[in-house]
Regions:
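Extended, hydrophilic extramembrane loops/domains of integral membrane proteins
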Residues: 1-7
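Residue-level signature of catalytic and energy-coupling elements of molecular machines
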Residues: 15, 34, 63, 91, ...
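Interfacial segments of transmembrane alpha-helices in multi-pass membrane proteins
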Residues: 17-72, 138-142
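Short helix-coil transition sites and intra-membrane helix breaks within transmembrane domains
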Residues: 26, 47-49, 85-90, 123-126
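Hydrophobic alpha-helical membrane-associated segments
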Residues: 33-39, 85-89, 157, 161
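Small-residue-enriched core segments of transmembrane alpha-helices in multipass membrane transport
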Residues: 47-68, 79-84, 147-162
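Hydrophobic alpha-helical transmembrane segments of membrane transport and translocation systems
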Residues: 62, 99-184
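Membrane-embedded alpha-helices of multi-pass transport/permease systems
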Residues: 87-90, 94-97, 167
Length: 184
C-alpha cells in the first residue's frame, strides 16, 4: 500500500520545552491535590502516606539520575502513573485497616491484619504493571522506552515505600503513643 503524506510540519525545541514545563506544572498541581486528599481522607495515616510518597518521588529521581536518564514527557507520565499506584497501595491498606478495626482485637492487630490482607493485592498489581513496563522497554523505542524505565523504577520504589516506609512510620508512631483507638 502506498503512503500519502497529508501534512508535514517541523517544530522547534521550544514546543518540547513548553510541553515539559506544562507537564511539570500538572504534576505539581496533581501532587498537591493528592497530598491534601490523603490527609483529609486518612488523617495522620494520610500524613504518613504523604511522607512515603515524597520519599518515593525522591527515590525515582535518584534512580533516574544514577542511570543518567533524561526526563521527558513520557517519563513524567510514568511518574504520574507511579504516584497513582503508590497512593492506591496506601488506600488499599488503610481501607483494609478500617475494616479490621471493626472486628480485630485492638488497633495494633487491626494494623497488622490490614497490611497482611492487603499485601497480595498490592504485590499482584505491581508485578503485572512491572511486567508491562519490561515488555514496553524491550519492544518499544524512544519515548515508549523512557516511559517504561520511569514506570519500572516507580513500581520498585512504590512497593518499597508503601510496604516498608509507610508501615514503619505507622509502627514507630504506634509504639511511641500506644493509642487505645485509632482513626484511619
Amino acid at each position: 500500500a502506498e503512503l500519502t503524506f497529508l501534512e508535514e510540519r517541523t517544530i522547534g525545541p521550544e514546543l518540547g520545552a513548553d510541553s515539559i514545563a506544562a507537564g511539570q506544572i500538572a504534576c505539581i498541581v496533581a501532587g498537591l491535590a493528592i497530598l491534601v486528599y490523603m490527609v483529609l481522607s486518612y488523617g495522620l495515616f494520610g500524613v504518613f502516606a504523604n511522607v512515603a510518597l515524597i520519599i518515593n518521588v525522591g527515590l525515582i529521581f535518584g534512580l533516574l539520575s544514577i542511570v543518567g536518564a533524561t526526563l521527558t514527557l513520557p517519563g513524567i507520565a510514568g511518574i504520574v502513573l507511579t504516584i497513582g499506584m503508590a497512593v492506591d497501595a496506601n488506600v488499599i491498606v488503610f481501607e483494609r485497616i478500617r475494616e479490621e478495626l471493626k472486628t480485630a482485637k485492638g488497633p495494633a492487630r487491626a494494623i497488622e491484619l490490614g497490611y497482611e490482607k492487603a499485601l497480595s493485592s498490592i504485590i499482584d498489581a505491581n508485578i503485572t504493571t512491572f511486567i508491562t513496563a519490561v515488555i514496553l522497554f524491550t519492544m518499544g523505542s524512544g519515548p515508549v522506552s523512557g516511559f517504561a524505565v520511569t514506570l519500572g523504577f516507580g513500581i520498585i520504589t512504590s512497593v518499597f515505600t508503601a510496604i516498608f516506609v509507610t508501615r514503619s512510620l505507622i509502627v514507630i508512631w504506634f509504639s511511641r503513643t500506644r493509642p487505645k483507638t485509632i482513626e484511619v
